[in-house]
Amino acid sequence: MNAKILRLNKAGIPVSWLTREETATLLVKDLVIWSLGDTVMEIRGGYNRQGIRSILRLPSIVACGGKVHKDNYDPPLENKFLFRRDKNLCLYCGGEFAWGDLSRDHVIPISGGGHDIWTNVVTSCRRCNNRKADRTPDQANMELLAVPFVPNQYEFLYLSNHAVLADQMEFLSARFSRHIQIS
């Protein structure tokens, strides 16, 4: 099983996804201060003198100590996350496409003063991107089907893992903004 474990800081804010090995290390070093969710895996160790085998149970969500940063969260803008945010839909024609047939479109083109930021990029099929060219949607007489948004930390962790477990999804989705919709 290759399930990832959701790592939180001590305030309960998601930080990253962990492998089973990373989670086991945190548990053994007693760095997990609390956990949630079901056991996703058991790691069996050796036997002690009394013949008792050690078992390490990995929960689906772990919280660790450390500093809690209050900075504004700035998720990395990569096509794989952008396409997942927009559900592989072209936000001009509404068609659903494979990743290889999608591209990143700047609503306000870079040449027109636009920036490569979450709130200025959408998923577009190659046909619509070529049709829009180096113009705004208004100039190209094309309608944008959704408003681009910056995913919060909870949404970004969802976007960055294709195999979110049910209890992890319950935890993350409770803090999703109204912008993101889960299929």
Report the location of each language-model feature.
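Alpha-helical hydrophobic/aromatic positions enriched in membrane-embedded helices and signal peptides
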Residues: 1, 97-98, 128
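Short helix-coil boundary/hinge micro-motifs
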Residues: 1-74, 79, 142-183
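Short alpha-helical basic/polar micro-motif
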Residues: 10, 123-126
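Histidine-centered nuclease catalytic patch
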Residues: 75, 82, 95-123, 132-148
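Short aromatic-cysteine micro-motif
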Residues: 79-87
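Short cysteine-rich clusters marking metal-coordination/redox-active sites
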Residues: 90-93, 125-128
